[in-house]
């Protein structure tokens, strides 16, 4: 084993309050939408189908905008501000300050790096992964990063993994 790749969202980082029920209420209010925060968990579950990758695995921002729109709709949000609200949610997802690193991430990356393993990131995000590494001080550990928004295809399309393997200079059987 020469390399280990990590996903970013919900593997290395988790969203803060901005992307919880009250955060979505605030998004809605800024766009003239009233939402019921009690419906947030069910809304996220219902909206999750919008994120499923179909046969066309190309990265399309609209998939994520639809997710935000659906969450707001499932929370009762209706009105002309819905589209702008969904787009703001999408844009804000890229802001590193809205996320926290899981507390075991740095120690784990440090240990793996010390063992001589190459570490990489593969993410279906539009967040700049260089900015992500800088914000969370991960540059010393990460040897390469590929996001679907810049590479063009979302996981599990083979090409995003091939791009990541190439970036680290390893073969598939040398990586996890």
What are these regions (language model features)?
Residues 1-103, 115:
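N-terminal helical cap/lid subdomain that shapes the substrate entry/recognition surface
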Residues 3-5, 120, 176:
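Hydrophobic "anchor" residues on beta-strands that sit immediately upstream
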Residues 11, 18-19, 126-128, 152:
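Short, solvent-exposed loop/turn segments at secondary-structure junctions
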Residues 17-18, 133-135:
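Short amphipathic alpha-helical segments
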Residues 36-39, 140-144, 172-176:
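Short acidic capping loops at alpha-helix termini that bridge into adjacent secondary structure
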Residues 83-134, 146-148:
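Substrate-recognition element of Asp-dependent hydrolases with the DxDx(T/V) motif
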Residues 154-176:
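Conserved Lys-Pro-Asp/Glu-containing loop-to-beta segment of HAD-superfamily phosphomonoesterases
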């Amino acid at each position: 084993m020469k390399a280990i790749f990590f996903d970013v969202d919900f593997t290395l980082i988790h969203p803060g309050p901005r992307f919880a029920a009250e955060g979505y209420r605030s998004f809605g209010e800024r766009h003239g939408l009233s939402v019921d925060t009690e419906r947030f968990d069910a809304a996220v579950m219902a909206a999750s189908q919008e994120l499923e990758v179909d046969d066309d695995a190309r990265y399309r921002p609209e998939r994520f905008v639809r997710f935000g729109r659906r969450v707001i709709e499932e929370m009762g949000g209706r009105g002309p501000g819905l589209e702008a609200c969904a787009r703001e949610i999408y844009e804000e997802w890229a802001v590193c300050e809205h996320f926290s690193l899981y507390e075991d991430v740095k120690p784990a990356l440090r240990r793996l790096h010390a063992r001589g393993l190459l570490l990489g990131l593969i993410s279906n995000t539009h967040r700049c992964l260089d900015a992500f590494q800088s914000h969370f001080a991960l540059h010393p550990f990460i040897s390469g990063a590929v996001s679907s928004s810049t590479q063009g295809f979302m996981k599990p399309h083979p090409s995003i993994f091939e791009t990541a393997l190439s970036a680290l200079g390893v073969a598939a059987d040398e990586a996890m």
